[in-house]
A protein has these predicted regions:
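Short, glycine-/small- and polar/acidic-enriched structural segments
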Residues: 26-173, 179-182, 198, 227
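A bilobed periplasmic-binding-protein/Venus flytrap-type ligand-binding module shared by bacterial periplasmic
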Residues: 48, 129-139, 229-245, 430-431
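Pocket-lining segment of extracytoplasmic ligand-binding domains
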Residues: 175, 181, 186-275, 393, ...
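Sec/Tat signal peptide C-region and signal peptidase I cleavage site
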Residues: 21-25
Length: 474
């Protein structure tokens, strides 16, 4: 009887302790706003979510020992509505570009609070990623041809900032020399198709997606502004101060997503396509070796300057009277801690400016590829990895040997002058006296090079014909 009574008392005590622990167990929300279709945000959102990487790093010791996590994801097509929900307290983290990020900081300050930029995810110190496109049948060949024309752009986006800088560089007045109208990318596609606008400026990936889909042609790349741009992640500063370990956990997940993408860009480009509908070749254009942008999680001086420039642009446009201080708006403490916890050297990465390297041999000759401004790639359908070639000529010869029945996802070339990665069917080519082809983004660039080498400028169809004829003559 005494034994039974003792057992009941022990059980009751255990239940009381358990009930007390349960009552005091904290549930912490981790609410992350993503931009899935803005594919250079993938390592800060889509891949973390789809690969369940955050669960690996969320803290579960110390003050987090009994914590339950309520992880929430919400996808957006632009930064402005994401910012609205962050300011409303519905989200803790958000991924967006420099310009909307500056607006995020201003919106928080207006509400008497603060947000901070905690990492870069993907960017270009030259400005690649943003671009201007025209309808595919347009006679426009460059920005100078757009004077007096209507150009649409998503207002308050990083592309908007790029467009204003490009117009200023032409010596034009944005209020009188061009007609700038606001237009979301999902509307711009049909407008370009129907020739309802003369040109459209947009951010990642639309300046390359629309040409890939055959409804537009790129006539200006953001790199021509030489103004750094990036997409990164922000966090509510109060949340970060309360849960710094969770912020570091999120960034460690981003670091792993970045590593996985570098190891197998084909695999994860296909995953991005599956989730977003953005075709895998467009994803690979950014995330593959020598891609349009550099996946870089460090706060290089150029990216800090991009934040400062965005804030100055907001003031110039009179978009805000509560702009954040660039010196404190960027906070690198969390990403430094995440690098350290991941066994990585932040300061070494900070000094590294190279794109994801291409270490490959020519698929035909087997020789190592050395000249990366003229490299070309062919991505066939199926599970086969991308094939690499030392030049467009070599790639086109290989395509000719595959025959018309070959299912080709995409062919990539690089602008000879800048090294910018391009879809081969969107490039201009110079054929020299020896039949060697050199690729360029702009016809003006091809024309100038053709004069240097006494060559002829041809389009993609003609370039393939040239190599086919050369192959037949062998």
């Amino acid at each position: 009887m005494k034994t039974t009574l003792r057992m009941f008392r022990l059980l009751a005590a255990s239940l009381a302790v358990a009930a007390t622990s349960f009552a005091h167990a904290e549930t912490i929300r981790v609410a992350i706003g993503t931009q899935d279709t803005t594919i250079n945000c993938a390592t800060g959102g889509l891949l973390i979510r789809e690969l369940h990487l955050l669960d690996k790093y969320l803290p579960r010791t110390g003050k987090y020992q009994d914590v339950k996590y309520d992880v929430q994801w919400k996808d957006f097509t632009s930064g402005a509505p994401l910012t609205n929900e962050m300011v409303a307290g519905k989200l803790d983290f958000g991924a967006m570009a420099d310009f909307p990020g500056a607006l995020n900081g201003a919106a928080f300050r207006k509400a008497g609070r603060k947000s901070v930029f905690i990492t870069v995810l993907d960017g270009s110190i030259d400005g690649s990623g943003n671009g201007i496109v025209v309808p595919s049948n347009s006679t426009v060949r460059g920005l100078a041809d757009l004077k007096g024309k209507t150009i649409s752009v998503p207002f308050a986006s990083t592309a908007h900032g790029m467009l204003l800088r490009a117009i200023k560089a032409q010596g034009w007045n944005p209020d009188t020399d061009v007609n700038i109208v606001t237009q979301a990318p999902e509307v711009a596609g049909s407008a370009l198709k129907a020739n309802k606008i003369d040109a459209h400026a947009d951010f990642v990936p639309f300046a390359d997606l629309f040409p890939y889909r055959g409804i537009a042609r790129k006539i200006y790349d953001g790199a021509q502004t030489h103004a750094p741009t990036f997409h990164g992640a922000l966090v509510d500063a109060d949340y970060a101060q309360r849960y710094p370990e969770i912020v570091v956990a999120y960034l460690r997940a981003a670091i792993e997503a970045n590593r996985l993408l570098a190891q197998n860009p084909e695999k994860y480009s296909l995953l991005i396509e599956k989730v977003t509908g953005i075709e895998a070749p467009v994803d690979y254009l950014y995330h593959g070796p020598l891609g349009i942008q550099t996946r870089d999680l460090t706060w290089k001086p150029e990216y800090r300057q991009a934040v400062a420039t965005a804030i100055d642009t907001l003031k110039l446009l009179k978009k805000t009277d509560s702009a954040p201080d660039p010196a404190t708006f960027v906070d690198d403490r969390y990403i430094r801690a995440a690098f350290k916890a991941s066994g990585l050297d932040y300061d070494a990465a900070l000094k590294h400016y190279g794109k994801q390297p291409l270490v490959a041999n020519d698929a035909t000759t087997g020789k190592p590829i050395r000249d990366f401004n003229d490299v070309a790639q062919v991505w066939l359908a199926g599970d086969e990895p991308v094939r690499n070639y030392a030049s467009p000529t070599a790639a086109f010869v290989a395509l000719g040997k595959l025959g018309p029945s070959a299912k080709v996802r995409a062919v990539f070339v690089h602008d000879h002058a800048s090294g910018l990665k391009l879809f081969a069917d969107q490039a201009w080519y110079v054929k020299d006296a020896h039949g060697v082809l050199t690729a360029f983004l702009l016809k003006s660039g091809a024309d100038a090079y053709a004069q240097q080498v006494s060559g002829a400028v041809v389009d993609y169809a003609a370039a393939k014909t040239v190599t086919a004829q050369a192959l037949a003559a062998r």
